[in-house]
A protein has these predicted regions:
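A flexible loop/linker signature enriched in serine peptidases of the S9 family
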Residues: 1, 12-27, 40-49, 63-90, ...
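Residue-level detector of Asp-centered blade-edge/turn motifs that repeat once per structural unit
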Residues: 4-5, 55-56, 117-119, 159-162
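Glycine-centered loop/turn positions within well-structured domains
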Residues: 7, 39, 58, 97, ...
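Hydrophobic beta-strand positions that form the internal "hydrophobic ladder"
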Residues: 9, 57-60, 121-122, 164-166
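Short loop/turn segments that connect beta-strands within beta-propeller blades
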Residues: 32-36, 93-97, 138-142
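C-terminal structured domain segments across diverse proteins
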Residues: 91, 158, 163-165
Length: 169
């Protein structure tokens, strides 16, 4: 992802480790394109899925299984292994690198995410039983609201950069 001011790029690398679980480890970096300095945001995590900047560039929205980020998204009894495809959302504050699990107690699996520049809300799709539903989350308090959609399977969403307009199918 590229920050809205164009100065920073989020990039991930991965390496294989076939001798133990997880077998692939990913590292997330923030690159300053003016100085070419990199900063490691997440090192060798086996369950991290993706990352995008907040509209103001002060936070990063991370997605991954409940086991990513040292398991801060886990909500199962000790000894149980969560579904690796049950993607959750986490928000990292770039100033202090603190990470908050935003969907730890949210049961549908997160799929596509869009952090909207106009209203600052995070819009996302999630597997909801046999449906793929549309949701909105307030990143400041974690409140999630299911949005009414005319489709049972919302496969993709897109939002205008400077207007309160969304398209989905």
């Amino acid at each position: 992802d590229i920050s809205s001011d164009g100065r920073y790029v989020l990039m991930m690398t991965s390496r294989s480790r076939l001798t133990q679980r997880p077998t692939t480890l990913s590292t997330l970096y923030k690159l300053d394109v003016q100085t070419l300095q990199t900063e490691t945001l997440v090192a060798e995590d086996g369950f991290l899925g993706g990352a995008t900047f907040s509209p103001d560039g002060t936070q990063v929205l991370l997605t991954g299984s409940p086991e990513c980020l040292d398991g801060i998204g886990l909500n199962l009894p000790e000894g149980l292994i969560p579904n690796q495809y049950d993607y959750q959302m986490y928000i990292m504050n770039l100033a202090d690198k603190k990470i908050a699990p935003m969907t730890k107690d949210f049961h549908p699996s997160v799929q596509q995410t869009v952090w909207n520049k106009v209203d600052g809300q995070i819009y996302f799709t999630a597997e909801n039983r046999d449906y793929i539903s549309l949701y909105r989350m307030n990143p400041s308090n974690g409140k999630i609201q299911q949005l009414e959609a005319k489709e049972d399977l919302v496969k993709s969403i897109s939002m205008a950069d400077n207007a309160p307009v969304m398209a989905y199918y």
